[in-house]
């Protein structure tokens, strides 16, 4: 079984400006560095990318190699090695600009302890997502978009 944390934030900037930043892993990941550690591995022939991503879930790092697909207004990644996890970043229209939604799914092993760890991980991941979204919002609203 897996657990998913989903959080959203409204960014008071045009959708195309927000989507350009939020769906470019090379720009987004340094902005949300509080989520964990990220290292670019390479671009594949089909235009997708591989990254090593280790997410901070409490005192442990979960993650491994991921396959990243970026097509504005969405960015997704799926683990190909290491802890099973995935992420969806989606930018949608909002009357005040754009809404950025991040959904992180983590699957941990084990039966009873695995379920307990997933429940704890969902809360921690949710707080990291909120912090990352606020960093992104602040960068777009008050800093200069890259």
Range-by-range predicted roles:
Residues 1-46, 146:
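Hydrophobic ligand-binding cavity/cleft-lining segments
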Residues 11, 55, 104-106:
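Hydrophobic beta-strand positions in extracellular immunoglobulin-like domains
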Residues 12-15, 43-46, 69-73, 90-99:
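A short, structured loop/turn motif at beta-sheet edges
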Residues 78-131:
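Beta-strand/loop substructures that line and gate deep hydrophobic ligand-binding cavities in soluble
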Residues 2-10, 48-50, 61-63, 74, ...:
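Intrinsic-disorder/low-complexity, polar/charged segments enriched in Ser/Thr/Lys/Arg/Asp/Glu/Gln
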Residues 29-30, 39-83, 131-146:
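Glycine-rich portal/gate segments that line the openings of hydrophobic small-molecule binding cavities
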Residues 16-19, 130, 134:
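Amphipathic alpha-helical segments that line or abut small-molecule/effector binding pockets
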């Amino acid at each position: 079984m897996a657990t998913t944390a989903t959080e959203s934030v409204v960014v008071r900037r045009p959708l195309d400006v927000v989507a350009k930043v939020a769906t470019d892993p090379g720009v987004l990941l340094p902005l949300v560095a509080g989520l964990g550690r990220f290292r670019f591995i390479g671009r594949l022939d089909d235009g997708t990318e591989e990254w090593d991503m280790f997410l901070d879930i409490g005192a442990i790092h979960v993650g491994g190699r991921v396959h990243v697909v970026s097509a504005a207004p969405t960015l997704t990644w799926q683990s190909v090695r290491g802890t099973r996890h995935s992420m969806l970043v989606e930018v949608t229209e909002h009357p005040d600009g754009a809404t950025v939604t991040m959904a992180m799914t983590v699957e941990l092993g084990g039966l009873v302890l695995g379920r307990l760890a997933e429940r704890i991980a969902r809360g921690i991941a949710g707080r990291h997502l909120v912090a990352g979204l606020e960093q992104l919002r602040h960068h777009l609203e008050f800093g200069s978009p890259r």
